[in-house]
Regions:
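N-terminal accessory segment detector
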Residues: 1-117, 133-140, 149-150
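Low-complexity, intrinsically disordered Gly/Pro/Thr-rich segments
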Residues: 120-136
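Glycine-rich GHKL/ HATPase_c ATP-binding element in histidine kinases
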Residues: 143
Length: 150
């Protein structure tokens, strides 16, 4: 038997982010897969935690929600680009959001489309309670997100 010397890896910020991002996405996929394996849907999983974020957005409103979304999507995708904006509506794209899942079509019985639908539902429910519409669609440029005051 040989003795192995272990050492703590030295990671740069990009490597740390990639590991954290993969952990986050894999946990989302596992949770959706778990729900499906038990005869439930991604909606069941999303509704479980969505009630916790409603009070925050009721307090902070449209501008805060849009800023949060731009921040999140900028962190989680290769490129985020605003296509149009006004004081009541913004449309932006996020490219290469979880390209591994998009390329493989599914991981652990969960598709890219299901993850996008889950995210749309996750943000859409609290938005509806505070007078905001939220929609997502998959395009050739990535995911297009539309947020508007009702």
């Amino acid at each position: 038997m040989s003795q192995t010397d272990f050492s703590v890896p030295v990671l740069n910020d990009l490597q740390k982010f990639q590991v954290a991002n993969n952990l986050c996405m894999n946990n989302i996929i596992m949770a959706i897969s778990y729900e499906k394996a038990h005869g439930r849907t991604y909606e069941d999983y999303g509704k479980f935690g969505v009630e916790m974020i409603i009070p925050f957005y009721k307090e902070t409103g449209f501008e805060s929600f849009v800023k949060d979304q731009l921040y999140v999507w900028s962190a989680m995708s290769e490129k985020t680009e605003i296509l149009s904006q006004s004081e009541n509506k913004i449309i932006f794209t996020a490219s290469k959001f979880f390209p591994e899942l998009e390329a493989q079509e599914q991981i652990w019985n969960v598709t890219y489309s299901e993850v996008i639908k889950w995210l749309e539902m996750l943000y859409g429910i609290p938005c509806a309670t505070i007078g905001i519409s939220y929609s997502m669609k998959i395009t050739d440029q990535g995911v297009e997100i539309t947020i508007a005051r009702k």
